[in-house]
Amino acid sequence: NARNRDRYKEFQKFADINRDGRLSEEELDRRDGLRLIKGSNIPWIDDTADGSKGSGLMHHKFMVIDNQVVVLGSANFTMSDIHGDFSKPETRGNANNLLRIDSKELANHFKKEFNIMWGDGPGGKPDSLFGIKKPSRKIDYLIVGGAQIRIKFSPDPEDTPREQTSSGLISTAIAGTKQSVDMALFVYSDQFISTILGERQRDNVQIRTLVDSQFAYRDYSSTLDMWGLQSTQDCKTGKSSVWKQPLKTVGIPNLASGDLLHHKFGILDRSLILTGSHNWTHAANHTNDETLVAIQNETVASHYQREFERLYQGATFGPTAKLVQATSKTCDERVKSKPQSNTEESN
């Protein structure tokens, strides 16, 4: 598809060291990350190792180092996501977050998740499990350095009680807020979370939301609920999730051209953060391999608050005129002319 073609063109420009328009074996040995891994005899598998063609997305972004240190967050380990596009020097890299946590107990939880997917590694038995083939796991609780941490790995089957899923953890945390909810999200389309947020708004909880510009104005985005507009999700379910008191604090950040808001975090009452690889979507909850952590700690929350304020300053708020016009059409017209895209989980 066009997205993959663009990615390959970007890689070509980066790997073509002598600029002759061709990629030599020497250039690939120096610039191709997977080739470097293979050349170093580091074992690797992908999410087809369970015998499938890759179910959903292997969307994790974590490392476990020496069974002691965990690195996790929203950042893909790519040049574009962290540093910016090689061919576009004006880009700065996507807006992301990473956490480094030194805890053997936490590392054990992530090592278990890794081992479920790894099985016995390349070759050998077909015992790797990805996506919906993995067993459902409960929410785990632990204390690290005075911080209360909850961990949840996805996906969960569709019939799993909502509160036991990752999106359920998000919803439960939001339901307990008293003062504020600030969210910076790549994509946001979970209607149940939107409903819980609407309930908190009616109880005078201050809500501010930033969503990446690629998704904020999509017909199915839950930003539409917050703006008082009907989404195509409402059309399909026949239930209205439209907020009766539209928000003026929902919009998109102004980033360098080509950069994305790739965060997947929420800050609740300036003391609890929700972060990880988990986009706030149905696919993240029930299809993809994902990580979600909830950390109760004011110091950690203050770092995320600073990042949110940086993005919020100068943001563009409210729906576009084009979106308002589009939502004025009947549901039949909208659903038939513009089916929901499946690209929401590509990051």
Residues covered by each model-derived region:
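HKD-type phospholipase D/PLD-like phosphodiesterase module
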Residues: 1-175, 212-271, 278-293, 298
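A short acidic, amphipathic alpha-helical/loop segment
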Residues: 172, 192-199
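Anion (oxyanion) recognition and catalysis
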Residues: 38, 201-202
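Long, C-terminal catalytic modules of enzymes
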Residues: 251-254, 258-264, 268-347
